UniProtKB/Swiss-Prot annotation:
<dbReference type="GO" id="GO:0009058">
    <property type="term" value="P:biosynthetic process"/>
</dbReference>
<comment type="function">
    <text>Verruculogen synthase; part of the gene cluster that mediates the biosynthesis of fumitremorgins, indole alkaloids that carry not only intriguing chemical structures, but also interesting biological and pharmacological activities. The biosynthesis of fumitremorgin-type alkaloids begins by condensation of the two amino acids L-tryptophan and L-proline to brevianamide F, catalyzed by the non-ribosomal peptide synthetase ftmPS/ftmA. Brevianamide F is then prenylated by the prenyltransferase ftmPT1/ftmB in the presence of dimethylallyl diphosphate, resulting in the formation of tryprostatin B.</text>
</comment>
<keyword id="KW-0843">Virulence</keyword>
<comment type="similarity">
    <text>Belongs to the PhyH family.</text>
</comment>
<dbReference type="GO" id="GO:0051213">
    <property type="term" value="F:dioxygenase activity"/>
</dbReference>
<dbReference type="Pfam" id="PF05721">
    <property type="entry name" value="PhyH"/>
</dbReference>
<dbReference type="InterPro" id="IPR008775">
    <property type="entry name" value="Phytyl_CoA_dOase-like"/>
</dbReference>
<protein>
    <recommendedName>
        <fullName>Verruculogen synthase</fullName>
        <ecNumber>1.14.11.38</ecNumber>
    </recommendedName>
</protein>
<dbReference type="GO" id="GO:0009820">
    <property type="term" value="P:alkaloid metabolic process"/>
</dbReference>
<comment type="pathway">
    <text>Mycotoxin biosynthesis.</text>
</comment>
<keyword id="KW-0560">Oxidoreductase</keyword>
<keyword id="KW-0223">Dioxygenase</keyword>
<keyword id="KW-0408">Iron</keyword>
<keyword id="KW-0017">Alkaloid metabolism</keyword>
<comment type="subunit">
    <text>Homodimer.</text>
</comment>
Amino acid sequence: MTVDSKPQLQRLAADVDVDLMCRLLEEDGAFILKDLLPLDVVESFNRELDVQMAIPPPKGERLLADKYPPHFKYVPNVATTCPTFRNNILINPVIHAICEGYFQRTGDYWLSAAFLREIESGMPAQPFHRDDATHPLMHHQPLEAPPISLSVIFPLTEFTEENGATEVILGSHRWMEVGTPERDQAVLATMDPGDVLVVRQRVVHAGGGNRTTTGDPRRVVLAYFNSCQLTPFETYRTMPRETVESMTVLGQRMLGWRTMKPSDPNIVGINIIDDKRLENVLQLKATDLPA
């Protein structure tokens, strides 16, 4: 089979039936949603990220950013610093329809992390990997176990072959190990701003190398949704309460400010306090609840 004849990533309209989306995650392991985010939302998000990029890095240890090469810029915690993310993108109904189907065997889910990566010219391609480094438990799950993590990739600039569009190996979620795949086994997730790449747990993928010599860096926000049975990689418990109360109930749930319910046999939930729901003890307000 030649490279051109390989099965490619399915590109779906955002209003396609969610059952088809979930079926593609089980069959192919990934798909692209076209034009999920309106361009005005993308532009607003980019402006907020520009502000964060301009802030000098804090002094002292940075657990992740200090490990990255100079061609690679990183901004963590966009849920706290970017209103467009937490009040729009984080509560997108299509993303949550996918998550509800995807996590139906394990119960509620929440955001594990969301951060910006900006990849400049000269950045080499990543090694092929699975998104399981933050929670090694995932590496030990049997193939038949229900998925407990979902990666959602938001391109905020154009993704091309030249600037390092994500490389995805379809069907690799059924592999026992990552091994040492050849790059021609992968397909390219070329995308425009507003598109979204949805990737099932265990799928082998990599960021491509940025071979461009002119133009802007490739900008992407990576969001990871996990079963509420996994502790999030980023904690949002330090967000100001007034910021949290400017959000919807769904947004608050995603950021760990409400009690969550795993699947049975758990009958009371997790993230509880004094045997009560967290939100009730806090008397937490939300924009979509009566005053």
